[in-house]
Amino acid sequence: MRVLITGCGSRGDTEPLVALAARLRELGADARMCLPPDYVERCAEVGVPMVPVGRAVRAGAREPGELPPGAAEVVTEVVAEWFDKVPAAIEGCDAVVTTGLLPAAVAVRSMAEKLGIPYRYTVLSPDHLPSEQSQAERDMYNQGADRLFGDAVNSHRASIGLPPVEHLYDYGYTDQPWLAADPVLSPLRPTDLGTVQTGAWILPDERPLSAELEAFLAAGSTPVYVGFGSSSRPATADAAKMAIKAVRASGRRIVLSRGWADLVLPDDGADCFVVGEVNLQELFGRVAAAIHHDSAGTTLLAMRAGIPQIVVRRVVDNVVEQAYHADRVAELGVGVAVDGPVPTIDSLSAALDTALAPEIRARATTVADTIRADGTTVAAQLLFDAVSLEKPTVPA
């Protein structure tokens, strides 16, 4: 079986796809990827072939003034880029899995439709499921997508002999999307009919921590992790400054993740250490708590490690209410949610005191034992099954 895995999004959107590709290859399938150029090195690290498509997602990797692939002003270019690059990558494939940016997903599904092979759209958080939206919201998304890039999509579809399509939001997501999220952290609701929950897609990380980080960890009390991942809006640096001040006020040391915002330490104090690319699976087992943005991946890794969390709402995007995982952490009793995008020192200090209380730490340890790690295996088996059922008939 040969599978094409595609996506256009942040590191948090992409890492699960890499995990699935690696697992498929372990099971004997041939997996290849189409991703933005940001992820060439990551795919090379795990030995998965990748075709780079379009412009970089990370602001620091783009030219000054160059718009991101999600900008409305460049959406027709994004559609053209994906229709241009996907055909060569999808040739000979038996199935396609995608996530992320809708214009790219619609192009990918069109190619799968042309070949008559299974297409699966994946979301990483239940609040992104179509079933979680009202009909009015879905109508709005469909109308907006059709207006912004419907003509471009249908022009490219016509060029490969496909009929026009409308309601592009529904078309890209399908009526049976996959949810690649752990059922404890992200349970389905009764209204999520048709959704297939596979469990989270996690790639075991065996990379050692750097000697410098090991020395810092060994040199004093257990630190608190502060990081905001792929968030790079101006408020991210301010949120990090507030978090550092709050942790210092508690008398604890800090490991700061540089992230896509290129965060820097406020001074050269010996109580802080900054990291770039790092094995969070290993690091989270060595810290007292994690202060982070509302991220599916970071939240899950902290839960698996059994450490308390302080999750800041709306750091990533203050327009879209990105607060699902912050609220789930609070509901599960494994941490505290605080309002962003720039929380106050007082709110963070109070949250840190609460999160480090014995009952929260005990609850975090208990919940860690319930987190599954077999999501990629479940998804791979679903693909094997789909290919055997939906494989197109070859004319005699």
Curated annotation (Swiss-Prot):
Recorded metabolic or biological pathway in which this protein acts: Antibiotic biosynthesis; vancomycin biosynthesis
Record EC number: 2.4.1.311
Reactions performed catalytically: dTDP-beta-L-4-epi-vancosamine + devancoaminyl-vancomycin = chloroorienticin B + dTDP + H(+)
UniProt GO BP: carbohydrate metabolic process; lipid glycosylation; vancomycin biosynthetic process
Keywords assigned: Antibiotic biosynthesis, Glycosyltransferase, Transferase
Origin superkingdom: Bacteria
More details: In A.orientalis different glycosyltransferases are involved in biosynthesis of the vancomycin group of antibiotics. GtfA, GtfB (AC P96559) and GtfC (AC P96560) are involved in biosynthesis of antibiotic chloroeremomycin, while GtfD (AC Q9AFC7) and GtfE (AC G4V4R9) are involved in biosynthesis of vancomycin.
Binding positions (dTDP-beta-L-4-epi-vancosamine): S10, R11, G12, R207, S230, E277, V278, H293, D294, S295, A296, G297, T298
InterPro entries: EryCIII-like_C (IPR010610), Glycosyltransferase_28 (IPR050426), GlycoTrans_28_N (IPR004276), UDP_glucos_trans (IPR002213)
GO MF terms, alphabetically ordered: hexosyltransferase activity; UDP-glycosyltransferase activity
Protein's recorded name: dTDP-epi-vancosaminyltransferase
Amino acids binding devancoaminyl-vancomycin: D127, Q133, Y141, Y169
